[in-house]
Amino acid sequence: MATIKEIKTQLLSVYTLDDPLLVELSEDPRTGVQRLIKHKQKEINQLRLKEEAFQARFTLERELWSNGIDLVAGIDEVGRGCLAGPVVTASVVLDETFDLIDVNDSKQLSSELREELYAKILTEAVSVGIGVCSNQKIDEVNILNATKLAMREAVGNLNVTPQHLLIDAVNAPIEIPKTVMFKGDSKSISIAAASIVAKVYRDHLMRSYAALYPGYGFDKNVGYGTKQHIEGLKTYGVTPIHRQTFEPVPEFLIK
């Protein structure tokens, strides 16, 4: 009879509820074995639900592909509500072989998982484009128009020409057929991938600014108006990367 430690190792290669090993072990009276079985069954069910959710987020892309539209780009932005730094957008084109089931709305993921997925998306995507609109441009044209400009730039930086765009929330003036939707990063795998790329790219950028402008906590708040950030404004004033039209930044400008 196998030991519980040996059974635990054997279960590592079990991926379905009807696996013969699970059926066989269900007759084992040992409490430790039954505990392992329950844990494995829960793990399999969680993986199945994750896979089903992943496939559901691929629905929009598959519908377009089935109609001969092969190059579909998902677009998302990050940083619209920040007091400092640029707004960053990403455009990501995937194909049917893409299988990173953890890809989801970047806000739902840990920073560690985002970093891991970011590297894999850059490798596995058909193409990735980044668009960056500076804080100066944001002050000049407003955040919505700056976001649209960054989205155009992201699409222009793809190394393929997409036939259709899937965009989260913002109806960017790009002369390509598009579908604009709210909460797109939870409905489209391409938009979700774009949300991860944009988020991680911008986080890296803001961490580099933290070294240039210490005292604001940019490495942690990435430009959002946290208590530490506001205290930094009170103590050190406005930096060259602050958005001067965003409250409360104007309060700290030298008159």
From Swiss-Prot:
Segments forming domain RNase H type-2: 70-255
GO cellular component, one term: cytoplasm
Chain positions recorded as a divalent metal cation binding sites: 76-77, 168
Pfam entry (one): RNase_HII
GO BP term, pick one: DNA replication, removal of RNA primer
Record-linked InterPro entries: RNase_HII (IPR022898), RNase_HII/HIII (IPR001352), RNase_HII/HIII_dom (IPR024567), RNaseH-like_sf (IPR012337), RNaseH_sf (IPR036397)
Keyword list, A-Z: Cytoplasm, Endonuclease, Hydrolase, Manganese, Metal-binding, Nuclease
Enzyme class name: hydrolase
Cofactor(s) essential for the protein: Mn(2+); Mg(2+)
EC number(s) stated in the UniProt entry for this protein: 3.1.26.4
Residues annotated as transmembrane: none
Co-factor: note: Manganese or magnesium. Binds 1 divalent metal ion per monomer in the absence of substrate. May bind a second metal ion after substrate binding.
UniProt-annotated location(s): Cytoplasm
Domain of life: Bacteria
Annotated catalysed reactions: Endonucleolytic cleavage to 5'-phosphomonoester
Record-stated family: Belongs to the RNase HII family.
Main function: Endonuclease that specifically degrades the RNA of RNA-DNA hybrids.
NCBIfam families per record: PRK00015.1-1, PRK00015.1-3
Name recorded for this polypeptide: Ribonuclease HII
